[in-house]
Every structure is written in structure tokens, then in C-alpha cells.
Amino acid sequence: MANQRKIINDPVFGFISIPTGLLYNIVKHPILQRLNRIRQVGLSSVVYPGAQHTRFQHSLGAFHLMSEAIKHLTAKGNFIFDSEAEAIQAAILLHDVGHGPFSHVLEDTIVKGVSHEDISLMLMERINKEMNGQLNLAIQIFKDEYPKKFLHQLVSGQLDMDRLDYLRRDSFYTGVTEGNIGSARIIQMLDVKDDQLVVESKGIYSIENFLTARRLMYWQVYLHKTSVAYERMLISALLRAKELASKGVELFASPAFRFFLYNNIDKEEFYHNPECLENFIQLDDNDIWTSLKVWSTHTDKILSTLSSGMINRRLFKVEVSSEPASNEHIEELKDIISAHLGIHREDAHYFVSVPRIEKNMYDPADDSIDILYNDGSIKNIAEASDMLNISLLSKKVRKYYLCYQRLQ
């Protein structure tokens, strides 16, 4: 008799069991396998060298947590059909399939206005056609068009399996222990009330830890000033490459990457031209790094300086402040940099970037988690928690970054 499941050894959760059939067919599908070639945390390895883990590993981890959540919810008497269980497992495996290399950078440069969520859905529908409609229910739940709302919340919500995995995993691989949330404990505390996902009141401390960990990970890892500077360099390099391509300058690029460099692709085009999706699924981190390596010796001074800086970790200098940099200071920097590099003054903007980043420590729209008490009453975490100072956490933290080319 054929083996009924495949077992994958994961450093974070141990052995992950994947049943043969639809779910295993998704795991080995080329579109999911492509995520093996895309890092989960983009450029964060410039700060945390251990952060080499991939979006594929994250998808498997989220799948494992979903399997655990199904087990605990059904043990508490919440009825989930086998077909629904398989559908939410399929949906979580595919939830990140629309990410490109350095996803948010691409959304700002070469695939403008098309979010990875849009592309994930397009790819799910494409795989669904190949699989003769076996993903119909998964897509319905993913789009929140299925009557049982809590199933969608498990895939995409305040306490979804995506978040529970990436915090644990990113914490593990970066070594930033603050993100190491008690995902197993949270999953054991999950329940369903009035078709909404809730957490039993005895799990409240785990939720407080989860919310705090999430915010700490944002500032310590995802929005770390050095990672932000590195990302800004990549955005500048890609925008310069795009400008040169529009003037007909020959640039080294893989066929898929070339398609996006030499064509202007917006949301409308992406939806209606099948070539866009075909080329997109051929893109991974290797396309970008290979081009940067070759561009580092390009005759265009701007492109070669940015590319070699990326390759050799000569990063933009970065200053963080609670106030934006003055226009005079920015213009003065552009004067100095253009003179130092011997480039036209109007091209100096490639070497100075002033992103503003803001984040609520607690966002009611994003973090509203319901706590279920023994008497059946429900309170929002903001009311239920005696530890989280919600009014303080709800204040927006706004940081102004000034990233610019080093002069030596």
C-alpha cells in the first residue's frame, strides 16, 4: 500500500505531516516550490545573518499550525467537515504564493499597484483550473465568501496561522527572542463563539505576549533601520535600471526579470495580459541578485554604485528621528553626493531617501481579539487586559528615516 503521508522535519516545529492527495500535490507544485527560492524576511539578513529561511518553510509551518488548530477546535465540539479542514489547509499553504522576490520592493518599483494578495488569488485560481476545481472551497474561504466566518479568520485574521508561524519562525532564525510567542498555547486556547474565533480567558497572558512580541519584532527586525536603508538602496537600483531600460540601454537580466524592466506593468495590464503572470512565477531572489552582480560593473555610474553597494554591503548611512529632515539638509546632501560621485545634480535623488514609517503598537482594526469567559460573555482584549495599556499602545509611533550614500 502506498505511503499515506509525507513527513518533513522542520527546525521550529519538528516533524510536519502532509497527507498524500490534494495537500501533497500543492506542496510539490512548481508554483509553491518557487517559494524555496524567496527569502521570508527579504533583506533582514543584512542585520541578522541567520535569517536565511524561505517563504516555503513559512508556508509549511503555517500549514502545521492550521492542522493543530483544526484538531483542538474539533475536540471542543466545533464541527468542521473534512472538506472544510482540507480547504483551509490548502488556503494556508497557498496564502503567500503571490509574493515576489523582496516583495514590497517590487510593489514599489517594477510591478506597481499589484499587491501580493492579488497575485496569490490569481495563482490559486490558476492552480484550481489545473486541479479541476479541487480548490473551489479553499478560494471561497480565502476570499471570505464562505458562511463559516471563523474558517477565514484562521487563514487571515488577527490570530491567523500566518502570524503565529512567522513570529515564531522569524524569531528563531534571527535570534531575536522577543518574538518567540507561545503558539501552541494560543492554539489550545482557541474556540468558536457565534461563528467568530475567540480565545478562552485563561489564554489572556499568551495574547498579551503575542501582541507585545509582534510590535517588538516590527521595530527590531522588519523595520530595523539598517534593513530599511538596504531596502531603499534596492528600490533606487531598480528604479535606475527601469529608467535606463526605458531609454533603450542594454541591461543584463533573466528573461522574466527583463520583461518587467522593459515593460511598464500596472494593475490593469497584470490582470489582462497572461504574459505578466507567466513571467512573474519565473521570478525569484536569484534573478535580482544575479542582475545586481552584473550591474555592479555597468558603465552607468549610478546603477553600478548602487548595485555594488548592495553586493558588497556598502550600505546607505541612516539617521532616524521623530522629526522629518529639513529640505535644506536634504538638498545639501544631494550637492555633496553629486560632487563626490561626479554625477548630474538631478540624479542625486537616487542616493538620498526619506521614508516615513508609522505603526500603532495596538490597532483596534488589526488586533481586536475577543476573549471568552466561563459565563459565556465576551470582551475585547482592550477591555479584558489589565496589563496592556491600550490607550498608550494605540498611539501612533512615527519615525522619519534619512538614508543617504556614504562618502567613503
Predicted feature residues:
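Histidine-centered, transition-metal-coordinating active-site segments
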Residues: M1-A87, P101-E107, V111-Q408
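Short alpha-helical catalytic segment bearing the HExxH-like zincin motif
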Residues: I88-L93
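Short active-site segment of divalent metal-dependent hydrolases/proteases
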Residues: L94, G98-H99
